[in-house]
Amino acid sequence: MSRNAQNGTGERQLRRLETFLDVAYAVLFVQFIMYLPETEDMAWAELPYGLLSLLIENSGELLRLVIAVGLTLFSWNLTNKLLAPLQRTDATHTFLMLLHLILVCLFLFFAISDPMLVTLSSPVGQSLCLAASGFVGIGAWYYARRQGFTRTSLSDADKNQVARTAVIEPLTALTNTGFAFVGPIAWTAGWLVIPVVLIAGRRQWERRTGRSR
C-alpha cells in the first residue's frame, strides 16, 4: 500500500474512532441519568416540598452522582484533548484509546455500584480506573507523536503542551486514591482541591523554567 493510501486510511480510521468514542461517552451519561431518585411510586407527592424534598433527602447520593458525571466529563475532555492534535491513527493507537475507554467504563461500574461510598473499594476503584485510563491515553498520545500522526501545523512546544495539560487529570485521580483511605468526605473534596493545587504548581514551575503556558 502506498504512503498516501496509508495516510488516507489512517485519517478515516481516526474519524471513526472519534465518532465511536463520542457515542460511547453519550451512552455513559445516559446510564448516570438512570440512577436519579425514583419517582414512579409518587411517594414524593406526600413530602412537604414534593420533588424538591426528594432531592434534598437524596442529596448525598446526588452529590456523588454529580461528581461521577463531572469526572466522566473530564475524561471525555481528556480524550478530545489527546485526539484533536492528531491527523491519523493506526491499529495500535486505536487499541490504546479503546483500552482508555474500557477503563472509564470500569470507573462507571464502581461509581454506580456504591454511590454512597459504603465500602472502600468504590472510591479506590474509581480513582485507580481514572488514573489508569488517563495514563493509557497519554501513552497513546506519545505513541502517536513518535509515529508522526500529529498535525504538521503543530510545533514541538505545542506537542509538549498537550502532554503537560493532559497529565493533570490522571495525577489528580492517582493522588486522590490516598484520600479514599481517609474517608468519603476527604475523597470527595480531593476532586475539587487537588486539580487546583496541581495546576497552580504547574504554572509556577513553568514561570520558573521560562516555559510558555
Language-model regions: role of each:
Residues S2-R213:
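Multi-pass alpha-helical transmembrane bundle typical of ion/small-solute transporters
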